[in-house]
Amino acid sequence: YFDGRIISLIPESLEIISNEILGEIISKKANILAGPTLGADPIIGGVLMKAQENSIQLQGAIVRKAAKEHGTGKQIEGLIQSSDKVLIVDDTCTTGKSVLMAAKATEKHGCSVVGIICVVDRDEGGRQEIEKSGYKFSSLLKVYNRKLIPWV
């Protein structure tokens, strides 16, 4: 079992992840990095810091499975607007359900999703589900025969 949250909580690996994802943001011209809470939270924070260091305009957003029943009642936390171009991120991709939920929630908000990226593709059908739903998918690492293969 690969716990993607662990590597995103180690500063050295989070820096590598953040640099790679920032490159994707630049190439896809996204202005929002969003993802499902909890796996995406540290990644979004790391990428936002890298963007700030490089004078790149970028905002973050966290997507809940469902809207809160109290407080603001929001499903998406962050300064997100209907004209935004969003890159969805998560630590791992197994079935694709969590990133698809986040993508659909941001589209419901009026945004366009320019792609989905995960740190690790577990190669358990998630990529296929995401692409079948019409999204472009990439990952930094892929599990192949129970081994991690870099930079897919």
Residue spans of the language-model regions?
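PRPP-dependent phosphoribosyltransferase catalytic core
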Residues: 104-152
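Short glycine-rich phosphate-binding loop at a beta-alpha junction
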Residues: 28-39, 117
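Active-site-facing substrate-recognition patch
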Residues: 1-29
